[in-house]
């Protein structure tokens, strides 16, 4: 990875962290993380995986769940981006990312806060699906203009 790619990854991580931390409804059973729009970027270009994984890890430090949210978020990202090597369709990748987020985040919310598992799985999964589909649409339309190859 060259310095330019490292710099772009650092900027993506920083933007993800900023969008997550300033969002008052970015954590919990009912959440809407606008920053998840960015999580589809590695589905278009895998060289941005490190930046997104780093961004998720740093952003989740600020979660009320603390370290467990860091582990869960990074795990979701690593699994989803690994699966994306075998799944080439960006929409299916956005879907699998959202399902993983719903299932794993709900488990953390259940174990740490005692929140109902299936309610959390559905609400987190749906909100993530909405934002990742928005991201997929945006980056499919204009990604080539705003993301360097």
Predicted features by range, described:
Residues 1-43, 47-50:
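Hydrophobic transmembrane alpha-helices
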Residues 43-45, 57-63:
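Interfacial segments of multi-pass membrane proteins
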Residues 16-21, 52-59, 105-108:
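Membrane-embedded alpha-helical segments in integral membrane proteins
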Residues 24-29, 61-149:
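Membrane-embedded alpha-helical hairpins and interfacial helices in multi-pass inner-membrane proteins
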Residues 36-39, 52-57, 137:
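Re-entrant/interfacial helical elements at transmembrane boundaries that shape
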């Amino acid at each position: 990875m060259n310095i330019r790619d490292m710099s772009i990854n650092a900027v993506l991580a920083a933007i993800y962290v900023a969008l997550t931390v300033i969002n008052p409804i970015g954590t919990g059973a009912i959440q809407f993380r606008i920053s998840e729009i960015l999580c589809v970027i590695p589905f278009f270009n895998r060289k941005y995986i490190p930046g997104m994984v780093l961004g998720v890890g740093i952003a989740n430090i600020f979660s009320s769940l603390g370290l467990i949210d860091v582990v869960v978020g990074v795990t979701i990202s690593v699994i989803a981006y690994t699966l994306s090597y075998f799944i080439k369709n960006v929409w299916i990748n956005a879907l699998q990312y959202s399902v993983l987020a719903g299932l794993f985040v709900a488990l953390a919310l259940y174990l740490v806060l005692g929140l109902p598992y299936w309610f959390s799985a559905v609400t987190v999964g749906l909100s993530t699906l909405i934002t990742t589909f928005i991201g997929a649409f945006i980056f499919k339309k204009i990604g080539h203009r705003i993301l360097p190859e």
